[in-house]
C-alpha cells in the first residue's frame, strides 16, 4: 500500500481496506533524498492504530514527518430530510428509517446526507427525491462500498412525541439526541417535534398518548429562574401542553425537564415561592466533555416500589432494592434534579410532607434519601406524569469503551415508562 505524501503538512497517508489489520504494518519501501537518514527503515514494523513519527536527518538539517494509516470507509453518517427530519441508521443491516408527518409530500423530499470523507454517494445529496418506495444509496470510497436502503414512514397522528428546544433532532445536544433516537427506534408511531411545532399546532396530537422531554444542559439547571431562562420555547407551548394533559395525555419528564410539572400547574404547590414553586430543590450537573468516569455501577433505590411497572425486567445486581444504571468506565455528567428530604433544609421534613404538598408519589430514592423518581397521578380526565431526576439516569457516555450491562436498564426503564403511561 503506497503512501500519499503531503509536503505542506509533512504527512504521509497510507490508505488500506476497511477490514485491514493495521496493528503491525511492515515498511516495504522508503525512499529518501540522497544523503538523508531516517529513524524508520525498510523492514520495520509499525503499529498504525495511531499516527507514527518519522525523524529524517540530512547533515545539519532535519524534518519530522507523520505517517498514518487511513482505512477506506464507506458509511452514511447522517441522513436528514428537508433540513428537519433525521433518519435512524441501522449500520448492521445498512438501513435508514426516517419518520415524517403525514402532511409532507413524499414524492419530493430533499435529503441532506453526511458520509465518509473522500467517499462518493449515489444518488447525490441535496437532490429532490421520490420516497414513495424505499430508495437505495451507494457509498463508494476506494476499496470500500456500502449500500443503504432508505425508507420514509409517514405518521399522521403520532402515538408518542419527543419534544425539544431545537427545531430539528440533529440540533439537540448529544445526550438528548441519543435518548430521542432510542425512542424513534423503539416506540411505535413516534416522532420528534420542537416546542415551536407544538405551540403552532403543526401536529395532530389527537391520538398521542405520551409526550417525553429529556432536558440536558451542561452545568445543570437549578431553580425556576434558571429553568425559564434556559427553556423559553417550552414555556411558550404551555397552553397547548396543558390542553394535551387535560384531554388525557401523559408526560414523561426526565432530568431538568422535571421542572415542568410546576410550570404546568400539575404540582399542587406550584405557586408556593417558599417551596421553590414545587420544583426539585436539589439540582446540579457536570459538563459532558469533562464527564466523570464511573469506577463501577451507579444506582438508586426503589425500596418499597419494586412492583411498579417502571422497574420490571431490569438487569439485577447484588442489591435487590437497587436500580443499577451504569457500568465501569462509563462517563456520566451526574445531572440531577431531585427533592431533598429532611428537617435541615429544603422545606420537606419527611416524605409525608412532600406528598401532601406536591401531590406526588415518590418511587425512587438517592443514597441520602432524596426523591429521584416520582409521579403525579391522573386527576379527572387528565393523564399521568412520570418524572426521573436521578443523576444515574443518563443516555450518553463520551467514552464508548465500556462493557454494557447495567446501562441497558436506562432503555428498559424508559420502555416500561412508556408502557405504563400509554396504558393508563
Predicted regions and their residues:
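Beta-rich interaction/scaffold domains
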Residues: 1-159
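Conserved beta-strand elements of the Class I
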Residues: 159-161, 386
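Helical hinge/lid and interdomain linker segments adjacent to catalytic or ligand-binding clefts
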Residues: 161, 165, 169-270
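Short, solvent-exposed loop/turn segments at secondary-structure junctions
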Residues: 167-168, 217-218, 258-259, 368-369, ...
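A short acidic/glycine-rich loop-to-helix N-cap element
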Residues: 172, 393-411
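Catalytic beta-strand/loop cores that center a nucleophilic Ser/Cys/Thr
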Residues: 287-390
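C-terminal alpha-helix
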Residues: 416-424
Amino acid at each position: 500500500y503506497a503512501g500519499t505524501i503531503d509536503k505542506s503538512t509533512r504527512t504521509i497517508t497510507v490508505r488500506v481496506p476497511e477490514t485491514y489489520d493495521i496493528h503491525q504494518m511492515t515498511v516495504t519501501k522508503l525512499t529518501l533524498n540522497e544523503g538523508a537518514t531516517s529513524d524508520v527503515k525498510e523492514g520495520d514494523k509499525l503499529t498504525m492504530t495511531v499516527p507514527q513519527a518519522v525523524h529524517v536527518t540530512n547533515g545539519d538539517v532535519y524534518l519530522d514527518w507523520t505517517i498514518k494509516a487511513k482505512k477506506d470507509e464507506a458509511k452514511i453518517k447522517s441522513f436528514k430530510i428537508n433540513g428537519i427530519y433525521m433518519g435512524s441508521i441501522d449500520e448492521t443491516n445498512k438501513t435508514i428509517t426516517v419518520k415524517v408527518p403525514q402532511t409532507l409530500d413524499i414524492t419530493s423530499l430533499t435529503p441532506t446526507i453526511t458520509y465518509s470523507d473522500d467517499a462518493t454517494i449515489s444518488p447525490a445529496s441535496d437532490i429532490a427525491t421520490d420516497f414513495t418506495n424505499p430508495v437505495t444509496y451507494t457509498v463508494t470510497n476506494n476499496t470500500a462500498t456500502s449500500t443503504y436502503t432508505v425508507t420514509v414512514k409517514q405518521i399522521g397522528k403520532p402515538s408518542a412525541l419527543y419534544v425539544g428546544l431545537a427545531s430539528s433532532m440533529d440540533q439537540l445536544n448529544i445526550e438528548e439526541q441519543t435518548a430521542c433516537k432510542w425512542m424513534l427506534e423503539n416506540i411505535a408511531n413516534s416522532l420528534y417535534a420542537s416546542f415551536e411545532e407544538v405551540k403552532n399546532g403543526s401536529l395532530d396530537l389527537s391520538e398521542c398518548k405520551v409526550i417525553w422531554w429529556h432536558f440536558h444542559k451542561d452545568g445543570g439547571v437549578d431553580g425556576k429562574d434558571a429553568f425559564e431562562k434556559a427553556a423559553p420555547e417550552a414555556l411558550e407551548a404551555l397552553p397547548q401542553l396543558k390542553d394535551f394533559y387535560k384531554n388525557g395525555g401523559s408526560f414523561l419528564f426526565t432530568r431538568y425537564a422535571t421542572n415542568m410539572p410546576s410550570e404546568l400547574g400539575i404540582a399542587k404547590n406550584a405557586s408556593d415561592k417558599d417551596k421553590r414553586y414545587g420544583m426539585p430543590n436539589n439540582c446540579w450537573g457536570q459538563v459532558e466533555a469533562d464527564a466523570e468516569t464511573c469506577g463501577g455501577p451507579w444506582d438508586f433505590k426503589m425500596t418499597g416500589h419494586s412492583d411498579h411497572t417502571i422497574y420490571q425486567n431490569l438487569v439485577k445486581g447484588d442489591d435487590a432494592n437497587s436500580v443499577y444504571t451504569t457500568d465501569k468506565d462509563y462517563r456520566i455528567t451526574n445531572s440531577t434534579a431531585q427533592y431533598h428530604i429532611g428537617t435541615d433544609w429544603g422545606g420537606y421534613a419527611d416524605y409525608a410532607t412532600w406528598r401532601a404538598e406536591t401531590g406526588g408519589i415518590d418511587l425512587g430514592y438517592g443514597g441520602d434519601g432524596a426523591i429521584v423518581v416520582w409521579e403525579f397521578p391522573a386527576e379527572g380526565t387528565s393523564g399521568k406524569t412520570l418524572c426521573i431526576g436521578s443523576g444515574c439516569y443518563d443516555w450518553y457516555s463520551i467514552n464508548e469503551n465500556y462493557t454494557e450491562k447495567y446501562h441497558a436498564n436506562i432503555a428498559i426503564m424508559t420502555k416500561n415508562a412508556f408502557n405504563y403511561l400509554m396504558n393508563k
